[in-house]
Structures are given as C-alpha cells and as structure tokens.
Amino acid sequence: MPYTTLGEYQIHYIHKGNGETLIIFPDNIHAAQAYEQEIAYFSANYSVIAFDYPGFGGSSHEQHHPDEIQVDYFGFRADLVCHLLVTHHIESCHVLGVGGGALAALHFAGNQAFQHQLKVRSLIADSFLADFDKRTLHRWLDTREHFYVRNIQRLETWHGNDWRMLLDRDTCFLRGLADRGGYAVPDKILNSISCPVLLTGHLRDAALPGLAREYARLSDLIPDCTLYLSGKSGHSYLERPFAWSDPSAFRLVADLFLERVTAK
C-alpha cells in the first residue's frame, strides 16, 4: 500500500489510472478502501487518488496537534490534501467529496487550494449539509450509529481492530460541535469557489433533512453551481450517500458534468 509522510503523519492512499487528477475526500468515518468502486470507475478516464484521513484507515492513528484539528476540523483535512498534492507535484485536480468529505472539499476549493497555488478544475459534492444546527448535527450522528451496527466487519477491515475507538473519538468531537450550536461552512468560502460545482443527493435521505432547501441556498452562494437531486434513494438503508445508493444515476450525472467541464 502506498504511503506518504506529511509532517508527523503517515498518510495511506490509493492511486489508480492516468489523466487529469481526481481526488476523493471520504466521508468522516470512511477510508479510501470504501471507494473502491468509484476509484475503479473514474480511473478509466482520470488519475484517481483516494486517501485516509489521519486517525483513520491505514494512516497514522495517533492524534497529533488536537487543538489545531478542533479549531479547523474540515480545513485541516483540506490543508492536508494540499500538501499531498504538492508532494506529488500535482498542480491541478478535480474533486469528489462525499458526506463529511464534501465539507472538507468545499474548504479545499474555496480556500486552501488557492493558498497553495493549486487549481481546482471541478468539484462534485454528494449527500451533505453545509449548515448543521445543533439538532440536525446530533440527529446526523444518531443516524450514523445505524451504519456502525450493520457494518462492523467492514469498518474493522477499513480501520483495524481499534475502529470503534477511532469512530467514537470522531463522534465525541462532533457531538461537542453540536453542543456548541452546530457547524456551518462560512459563506466567504462558498463565495470564493471559482470552479464549476455539482451538488448531488437524494430527497429520501433521512439523515439530511431539508436537503433541497440547503442545496438551493448553496447554489445562491457558489458562483457556478449545478444541482441534481433524485426523488428516490435506490436503497433501503437511507443513510447511505447517493453515490452508493444509486451509483448508476450518480455516475451518469457526474460524467455529464465532467464532460462539460473538460470541454471548456
């Protein structure tokens, strides 16, 4: 498995394919391995990189500088990707962010990439809210517990024997955010995203109430924004992201979007 050293962290990543770079920001509790099907699909046309956040998957499980992470949780992950790209001499990329990974991807496209002189060519953000009030964030975390119950073996494969401790640590931090009022991606970051953006999701996602209203709000803030919302989940477990619950529809929409972007 390929690794790269970024400061005090060993970062595990998966790299497959050739062409323009497409980097995947996993959902909070996922590892790069969780996106094997997306990697296999998009690597037919792109050089796909999916990585494990520090504390998850095959990356270092030690938690260094917790104060920095707590101050800028999603921005920290966005900054990490900048260093990963710079280390590999990659100057531009397309981005796919899922769930909590979409929040880090928004930070990356609207702030950190510019700071590191990286060009973001496009961004696909799937199944997320960029504004969690206290109640909604607690509810999202409650729903996430159902994913644990049905996927114990998978989570252990992704993260190792200490998977429960890692996920509980993430949940504890996010519960703290919720208790302090929730979390919202700042408008100035959304306003600063200069690349084309595609927001995807399904309207039956029980973990993301008011998704259509939230995406409409984001489309007013992001300069070049396209929406696709499915009327069905395609899967009985509604907390799954649209990219997984209806992969054929997601890939069709993503392909059309990327074709438009690359044709410019």
Task: Identify the meaning behind each predicted range.
Residues I193, L199-G201:
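Short beta-strand/loop motif that positions the catalytic acidic residue
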Residues M1-F25, N45-Y46, E91, L252-K264:
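Alpha/beta-hydrolase fold catalytic core
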Residues C172-I189:
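Active-site nucleophile elbow and catalytic-triad environment of alpha/beta-hydrolase enzymes
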Residues A206-E214:
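Conserved alpha/beta-hydrolase "acid-adjacent" motif
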Residues C225-K264:
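Catalytic active-site module of serine/aspartate enzymes centered on a nucleophile-bearing elbow/loop
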Residues L103-N151:
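Flexible "cap/lid" loop of the alpha/beta hydrolase fold
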Residues Y9-Q63:
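Conserved HGGG/HGGXW glycine-rich cap/lid loop of the alpha/beta-hydrolase fold
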Residues A50-C93:
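Active-site loop/oxyanion-hole signature of alpha/beta-hydrolase fold enzymes
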